């Protein structure tokens, strides 16, 4: 509906690219044209068709999970169904990885994009990582977002990286590649430009200190 309205009014009314609507043929042409790595970030608890289309389009990084893409976006969706649907996603990614480069799965660490206790973030990240690795995924990214405390963020990164490696080895998946993603501040930004600049710069320093494999940036 929103795609149709956008075309009729010649105004973009979509929050993102309608991948399923355009289909894999059109999307693959676009991916080939730009020749840049694309990460799928969507926000749906049932991503089965979306993931199939994404992989056929040439997208090799899939964000989300049964918890991190359920609680922040779809509070009325059944949790057990979300786990069942994402288990299918993990198997698809694992099987496709056998034919090509490993599909990187990434959990959405910021959760509700508000201040979440690091212990909750870490436990949820580990749960989604284990679900993914148990289905055969060989590349997984755990993540979390800036909290406002440099010390807390550094400790969170160290614990998350250490625990992820530990539990991956516990289930016989020590050969999996585990990456760390750091999200810059996900909450409301200060109205003062200098304060906002300081927030962005501080998060960049933290990402460097924890040696994040990827940083989700905020534009100025």
At which residue positions do the language-model features occur?
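Catalytic alpha/beta active-site cores
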Residues: 1-129, 133-135, 139-143
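Secondary-structure boundary elements
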Residues: 91-101, 130-139, 159-176, 209-213
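A generic structural motif
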Residues: 146-151
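Active-site capping/gating regions of soluble enzymes
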Residues: 152-170, 177-220
């Amino acid at each position: 509906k929103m795609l149709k309205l956008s075309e009729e009014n010649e105004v973009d009314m979509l929050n993102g690219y309608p991948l399923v609507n355009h289909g894999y043929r059109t999307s693959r042409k676009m991916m080939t044209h730009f020749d840049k790595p694309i990460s799928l970030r969507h926000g749906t608890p049932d991503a089965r068709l979306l993931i199939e289309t994404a992989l056929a389009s040439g997208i090799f990084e899939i964000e989300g999970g049964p918890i991190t893409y359920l609680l922040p976006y779809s509070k009325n969706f059944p949790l057990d169904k979300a786990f069942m649907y994402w288990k299918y996603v993990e198997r698809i990614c694992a099987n496709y990885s056998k034919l090509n480069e490993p599909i990187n799965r990434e959990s959405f660490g910021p959760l509700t994009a508000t201040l979440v206790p690091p212990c909750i973030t870490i436990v949820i990240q580990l749960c989604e990582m284990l679900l993914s690795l148990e289905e055969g995924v060989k590349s997984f990214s755990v993540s979390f977002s800036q909290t406002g405390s440099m010390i807390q963020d550094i400790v969170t990164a160290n614990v998350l990286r250490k625990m992820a490696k530990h539990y991956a080895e516990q289930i016989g998946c020590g050969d999996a590649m585990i990456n760390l993603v750091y999200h810059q501040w996900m909450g409301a930004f200060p109205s003062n430009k200098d304060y906002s600049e300081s927030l962005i710069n501080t998060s960049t320093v933290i990402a460097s200190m924890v040696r994040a494999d990827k940083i989700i940036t905020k534009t100025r």
